[in-house]
Amino acid sequence: MATRPGPLTEWPWQWMGGYKYLVLAPVAMHTAHRLATKGWGDFDPAYTFMLPTLLLRMIHNQIWISLSRYQTARRKHLIVDRSLDFEQVDRVLYLDDQIILNGLLFYLGYAIIPNFRLMPVWRTNGALITILLHMGPVEFLYYWFHRALHHHFLYSRYHSHHHASIVTEPITSVIHPFAEHLAYFLLFSISILPPIFMGCGSVLAGVLYITYIDFMNNMGHCNFELMPKWMFQTFPPLKYLIYTPSFHSLHHTQFRTNYSLFMPFYDYIYNTMDSSSDELYERSLKGTEETPDIVHLTHMTSLKSTYHLRIGITSISSKPCNDSVWYMWMLWPVAWLSMVLAWIYGSSAFVVERLKLKKFSMQVWALPRYNFQVMDSSALGKVSPSTILIEKAILDANEKGVKVLSLGLLNQAEQLNGSGELFAKKYPRLRVRLIDGSGLATAVVLNSIPFGTKQVFLCGSNSKVTRATAIALCQRGVQVILNQEKEYGMLKSRVPESRAIYLKFSNDETPQIWIGDSIDDAQGRAPKGTIFIPTSQFPLKKARKDCTYLSNPAMKIPETMQNVHTCENWLPRRVMSAWRIAGILHALEGWEMHECGDDMMTIEKTWSAAIKHGFKPLTKPCSLNSGTDL
């Protein structure tokens, strides 16, 4: 929103929320009626291309968003290296408003302009007129209109909404008040309407012109430099005819320079070109390689989790993952295509996120594999494709000089690699420290148990964290009850003999505190009011309304952590899993040991370090020193 919003700032359908697409319902109904009564033979090229054009524009924009986020995470050709936060993401989510407006105006033009319905697929003379009109009147008028928008009166009421984003993304290009979009539509109509009225317009010329506008807008706001130098060396006048991402980025950081639409020519002749334009272009194009201090290695979960990656769909990745949302089912074809591409081309981990805390830089790498691929039962017990990918990522991190690599989700599965022990033993001279995060995860689980708890039910002990939690509770005088003989026998051999009395096998007792990694299937046996505390990285199925479900082991991150604008899987905003935080703490504290296999950081030590560095528990902290405080 602008600093002092003026008339026509909000979109007319803003009050409709997620139902705003209903404004296109009359158009859809008219199309359906026309198809039912007259058949496909009555559809002319202009009418036929309208809906596909709108859909292709949305796909085109999404490709740019994904490409930009991937490149800025890699950082090499980054232009503006500043933090991006949730406030900006929420402000720029609604790129589809422009598509809806354009759809309505296109259909309106089709209905009232006879020549619109007579356009052929292609006419060269009309396309040339469109190009000339854009290079002349459109670029010229836009330049002066843009300068006018930077006058205090219009800037405070309208254009400041766009400039609230100093760190730009492709989506920033269409984030303007409604009134500005109307003005831009009229401006671009100067290139489209005259050929139509002259009888030389064509459908393809219009579609290509709109695609050109979208391409240049997205490129100018992508925040990484990609225009090759050889283009300007081969044809020097080109620097006056096409801008670069760094050229327009200066407009967002300096505000009163580089006003041109797509052709810097007008900034040159009116002396408003930023003097550092060439230098910033050279520096951004050359780029610098960044070696992160910390890497968190994750992977995709379900097929639809592709959209939840930072390089996926912005409106989805900025919220906790929810596969049950209705529109996710509409995207199934894209999910399947992503899986196929990941299987064919996914030979290594790729960067999806870049963060910073204090002097430490962090990256998130994702393996191009899903849950069902990582834990493929046919590959367990032998070297699986996922194990090879994890090993390759570890060796890449080691070669680059990464200090700490934390294993997320199933990348640390005991059945797969012994919580990372396989790699630590195979490569004893690894400089990068491998972290499974079990120490901090156990500390968070212990901290989540209500004060005064004397008895807990352990549901499953398949994970390192679950076993460590049970042993810690016994050592603190809290009775741990199991109803599985095999698990009971395994745990009893690990609990100190003096504390074995606190480990109990029983089929009759059901305390109201349930802890473990296999809770989902056993929830029906829990008494009313039970508190479920998971030890797994995956969320519980909330099958009971009369029970309380706590989060997976996780903590709130410090306010000083920069560039956080996506959610980690199903966790809330600015919350990280304990396994991921453990890797960060390892680097912050300068700890030298691996935490993998049977090795685990001291629970009290990791908890104290987390609190010291500004991480906060999601629940009220409990003492870790005695059972009575649990």
Swiss-Prot record:
Residues 133-272 form the Fatty acid hydroxylase domain. Keywords: Endoplasmic reticulum, Lyase, Membrane, NADP, Transmembrane, Transmembrane helix. It is found in: Endoplasmic reticulum membrane. Expressed in panicles at low levels. The chain crosses the membrane at residues 93-113, 126-146, 185-205, 325-345. Its main location: endoplasmic reticulum. The keyword Ion transport does not apply. PANTHER family: STEROL DESATURASE (PTHR11863). This is Very-long-chain aldehyde decarbonylase GL1-7. It comes from Oryza sativa subsp. japonica (Rice). The gene is GL1-7.
